[in-house]
């Protein structure tokens, strides 16, 4: 199966069941929130200590996923009402395919925590990246890692069409790289840490940023849920912002770290090192021009163009401005 057919299959799948979006939890006294394991964030302290339920007055079912593409499908089916830290590329793929989702806040920025790793035995670095031509690579299609992979290969002049690209979740890619089953693997979080044990990156986070490879995740939700439950969503975002502020105060980190690590399924050292590479923009920063005030929308247009030019999606939206809804985040400022 080709890159395009796999990604379009996922997009078509969410489009076919998009009508189910409205069938969210009746009355919303109970909702389901998607998140990632091995992706430690301050919100997990609030998750584990009941802060969300207390603020929202609703029961929350937390379900872990292995990719943002899977999150989109779950929101389309009505099984998930909010996704925390969904990558921008899978979001762009979903809305470009007709799914009515909206970004409601910037969850995290992490240029150093999403990358591709080349098997150490190949002895390939950025000076010899052209030798990757024809190699086998594990990539979670439709994700931030996929976008970064395409941009890096374009930068190095490597024809992706001539590579053997295999769709693998990051954890699977890390295992395949360690076993010598692939020459390169792309991913994030704990899986990326394991990949680095078997190889080396080509570009640092700073070098990727210079190429325009921005890496950030968003909190997303079906537009129907945002319209129906704006107040509930604002309360969710307020708790998230409070948890981020708590983590920013080093005095709180000793009590928060063990809780976050346990929920993320990681040890405390790995959790601390991963969090050190994360940036959690404040509410005011998120609403500024660099993020939801226009920068994110422009970036999504660029992501769509890369996917369109590479044949991974059939069409892009004329504008992605309508896929961002800042009303709930604006409400947080008044809380």
Language-model-detected regions and their locations in the chain:
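Bacterial N-terminal signal peptides that target proteins for export
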Residues: 1-10
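Secondary-structure end/capping motifs
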Residues: 227-312
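Sec/Tat signal peptide C-region and signal peptidase I cleavage site
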Residues: 19-25
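Ligand-binding "clamshell"
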Residues: 27-29, 93-105, 194-208, 267, ...
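Bacterial N-terminal signal peptides
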Residues: 9-19
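Conserved C-terminal helix/tail region of periplasmic/extracytoplasmic solute-binding proteins
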Residues: 300-335
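Short, glycine-/small- and polar/acidic-enriched structural segments
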Residues: 26-159, 164-167, 183-189
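Pocket-lining segment of extracytoplasmic ligand-binding domains
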Residues: 172-264
């Amino acid at each position: 199966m080709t890159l395009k057919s796999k990604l379009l299959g996922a997009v078509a799948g969410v489009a076919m069941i998009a009508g189910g979006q409205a069938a969210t939890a009746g009355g919303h006294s109970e909702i389901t929130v998607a998140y990632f394991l091995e992706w430690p964030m301050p919100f997990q302290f609030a998750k584990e200590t009941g802060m969300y339920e207390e603020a929202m007055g609703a029961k929350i079912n937390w379900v872990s996923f292995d990719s943002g593409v899977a999150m989109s499908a779950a929101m389309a089916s009505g099984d998930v009402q909010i996704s925390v830290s969904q990558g921008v590329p899978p979001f762009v793929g979903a809305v470009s395919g007709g799914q009515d989702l909206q970004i409601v806040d910037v969850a995290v920025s992490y240029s150093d925590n999403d990358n591709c790793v080349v098997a150490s035995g190949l002895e390939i670095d950025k000076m010899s990246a052209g030798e990757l031509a024809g190699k086998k690579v594990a990539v979670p299609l439709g994700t931030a890692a996929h976008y970064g992979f395409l941009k890096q290969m374009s930068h190095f002049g490597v024809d992706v069409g001539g590579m053997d690209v295999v769709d693998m979740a990051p954890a699977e890619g890390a295992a395949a790289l360690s076993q010598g089953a692939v020459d390169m693997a792309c991913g994030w979080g704990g899986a990326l840490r394991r990949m680095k044990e078997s190889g080396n990156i080509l570009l640092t986070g700073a070098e990727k940023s210079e190429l325009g490879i921005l890496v950030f995740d968003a909190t997303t939700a079906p537009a129907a849920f945002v319209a129906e439950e704006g107040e509930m969503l604002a309360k969710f975002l307020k708790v998230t912002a409070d948890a981020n502020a708590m983590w920013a105060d080093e005095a709180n980190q000793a009590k928060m770290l063990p809780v976050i690590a346990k929920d993320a399924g990681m040890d405390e050292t790995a959790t601390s090192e991963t969090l050190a590479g994360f940036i959690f923009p404040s509410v005011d920063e998120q609403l500024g021009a660099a993020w939801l005030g226009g920068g994110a929308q422009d970036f999504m247009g660029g992501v769509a163009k890369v996917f369109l030019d590479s044949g991974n999606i059939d069409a892009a939206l004329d504008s992605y401005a309508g896929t961002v809804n800042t009303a709930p985040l604006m409400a947080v400022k008044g809380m």
